[in-house]
Amino acid sequence: YRSTDPEHFDTAKEPVATANIQTGYTVVPDSLQTYRYYFLLRFNDRYDRIVGPRAERLKYIENFRDLGGYETKNGKQIRWGKIFRSGEFNSLTANSISRIKNMGIKTLIDFRDSEDIIKTSPELGFDNVINLPGSLHYRQNLLPRLEKEELRRGDANLFMQDLYVAMVSGSKRAFKSMFNQLLVEDNYPIVLSCINGKDYT
C-alpha cells in the first residue's frame, strides 16, 4: 500500500503492488513526482511494516534524508516523516519546492553560521525558521594556511578530525537548543539543516 502520510494507509483499496516474497522485489510506478511516498508492506495478511525511501531526490539539495525507520534500543522505531536532515535550501527548482511543501515540514532548524547563511526561500512555507549557529572557531587555524597554500599531505584528515571535535565541544548550546525544539510537538515535521547536510546534522 502507498500513502503520502506514513501513519495512514487505505488498506480497503487494492495494494499498488504485490509480490512473492521469494522474488525479493516489486516495481511501483511513480506517476506523481511531486509527492513523497511511504509504503505499508503486508506479509501474508498478518505482519505489517512501514518503509520509505531514505534519501529524497531533490535537485540542488544535498543529502536530504528521512530519519524515520531506525530502531531504538527498546525495539521501537523512529516515526517516518517527522525528522529530516538536509543541506542548505538554496537555488531550488520549482519541482523541489513543490516536493518539500507537500511533505508538510513546519520547522527548519538551521545550524549555519552568519558567515554561511543565505535567507531560506519563503516559498517553502516553513512556519518556523530557527537559526542555531554552530562553532566556527575551527576555521581560524585553517584559513590562513589555505590562503598561503601551506597545506601538507595529511592535513585534510587532521582538519576533519579537529572539525568534529570542535563541533561537539563548541556547539553544546546549539545542540541543547535543538533538543528543546524537538520536545515541542507543534514543531513537527522538522528538518535539521547545515551547509552540506552531513556534519552538524
Residue ranges and their predicted role:
Residues 1-191:
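Cys-dependent protein tyrosine phosphatase-like superfamily
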Residues 188-201:
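A phosphate-binding catalytic loop at a beta-strand-loop-alpha-helix junction
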